[in-house]
């Protein structure tokens, strides 16, 4: 894909490629491009839209024509989605792309290109790496904007589920006063494709990022034809991801010990089904119960906690609006089953009691033995000093 567009290429006589920025969802590539179509723009617009991001996606051979057509239709839909906290899409070109490279004109087929707003600030991931975590007031301010953007997508006439919410897809403006969500178009389309896709055993077929994926992504259902298919996603897919992001913004890490082993992705994703969310107050004493409860309700996918799980982003926004009100903890610390506690318990059960006595006895013997050696050396030094 990197060879398809090169620095200096002029795309559709509108955009000139300046550099490759990054990889995106669905094996797409993001390029920074100069906007050559600014004749009718005023000074402010020229400054704002002088550079755009071009997202380029080439048709995957595994996607059939019907699903590819749906994908193209959804890309056009993204240009109609307008919210202050969503990256704007201005232009969609498909399925042919015309490139001028030097004296050559190249025509590419089975490609879709989306021209999007360029946000020149850092991502949430970059800020987390730099700051560690945010203050409570900062979190409420930014997180509310993120949730409002997702609520808008969920309220759209063809409900759009993002499905890949993570700090890398949350961008800040250069002055850090606002945020923009990225990749909502790509993710929503995959939802439609996934509903008709058979459940695959290949771990890489899972769409999203493991640390932010709700365990429901592993569940399947049987369609009218008796075929096993993936369970259609719903609003709680994004709500769960929001809870993980809220936790990470306040604490600086994801809640579960999710060391990503490519061979154990399913086991990692299931952890939220088996363990409770750790209390953030164990790390920071200034976190109010209200935010503890919001994070808990977003991620309450453990069977016994389902009664607290948010059913919509509107419920979440109501709680965010009242975050300063005093409230009791929904599930106190002594009632939560935490990942680390269970691992220690399981480790102890794997070893017989005699093994622990033997280990402790050996440790005590070693300490006493070393102490005697040190004492002997000290006495010897004292003796030599006197005589």
UniProtKB/Swiss-Prot annotation:
SUPFAM superfamilies: Protein kinase-like (PK-like). Its EC number is 2.7.11.1. Residues 15-344 form the Protein kinase domain. One of its GO terms (biological process) is signal transduction. It is a multi-pass membrane protein. GO terms for molecular function: ATP binding; protein serine kinase activity; protein serine/threonine kinase activity. The active site is at residue 164. Keywords: ATP-binding, Cell membrane, Kinase, Membrane, Nucleotide-binding, Serine/threonine-protein kinase, Transferase, Transmembrane, Transmembrane helix. Disruption phenotype: Probably essential, it was not disrupted in a global transposon mutagenesis study. GO terms for cellular component: plasma membrane. Disulfide bonds: none annotated. Belongs to the protein kinase superfamily. Ser/Thr protein kinase family. This is Putative serine/threonine-protein kinase. It comes from Mycoplasma genitalium (strain ATCC 33530 / DSM 19775 / NCTC 10195 / G37) (Mycoplasmoides genitalium). The lineage of its organism: Bacteria, Bacillati, Mycoplasmatota, Mycoplasmoidales, Mycoplasmoidaceae.
């Amino acid at each position: 894909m990197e060879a398809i567009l090169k620095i200096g290429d002029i795309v559709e006589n509108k955009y000139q490629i300046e550099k490759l920025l990054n990889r995106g969802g669905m094996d797409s590539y993001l390029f920074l491009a100069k906007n050559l179509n600014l004749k009718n723009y005023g000074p402010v617009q020229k400054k704002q839209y002088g550079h755009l991001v071009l997202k380029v996606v080439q048709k995957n051979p595994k996607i059939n024509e019907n699903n590819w057509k749906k994908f193209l239709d959804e890309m056009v839909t993204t240009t109609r989605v307008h919210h202050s906290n969503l990256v704007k899409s201005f232009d969609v070109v498909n399925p042919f792309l015309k490139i001028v490279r030097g004296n050559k004109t190249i025509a590419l087929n089975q490609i879709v290109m989306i021209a999007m707003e360029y946000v020149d600030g850092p991502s949430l991931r970059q800020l987390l790496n730099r700051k560690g975590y945010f203050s409570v007031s900062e979190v409420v301010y930014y997180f509310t904007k993120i949730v409002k953007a997702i609520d808008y997508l969920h309220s759209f006439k063809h409900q759009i589920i993002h499905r890949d919410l993570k700090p890398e897809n949350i961008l800040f403006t250069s002055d850090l006063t606002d945020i923009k969500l990225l990749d909502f178009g790509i993710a929503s389309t995959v939802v439609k494709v996934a509903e008709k896709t058979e459940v695959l055993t290949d771990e890489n077929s899972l769409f999203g990022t493991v640390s932010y994926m709700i365990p429901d992504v592993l569940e399947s259902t049987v369609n009218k034809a008796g075929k096993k298919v993936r369970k259609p996603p719903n609003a709680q897919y994004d709500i769960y991801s929001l809870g993980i992001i809220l936790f990470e913004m306040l604490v600086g890490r994801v809640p579960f010990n999710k060391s990503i082993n490519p061979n154990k992705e399913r086991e990692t994703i299931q952890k939220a089904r088996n363990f409770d969310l750790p209390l953030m107050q164990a790390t920071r004493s200034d976190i109010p119960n209200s935010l503890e409860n919001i994070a808990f309700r977003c991620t309450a996918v453990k069977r016994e906690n389902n009664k607290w799980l948010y059913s919509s982003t509107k419920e979440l926004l109501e709680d965010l609006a009242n975050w300063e009100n005093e409230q009791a903890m929904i599930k106190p610390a002594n009632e939560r089953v935490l990942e680390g506690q269970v691992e220690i318990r399981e480790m102890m059960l794997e070893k017989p009691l005699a093994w622990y006595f033997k280990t402790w006895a050996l440790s005590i013997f070693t300490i006493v033995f070393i102490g005697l050696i040190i004492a002997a050396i000290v006495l010897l030094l004292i003796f030599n000093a006197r005589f």
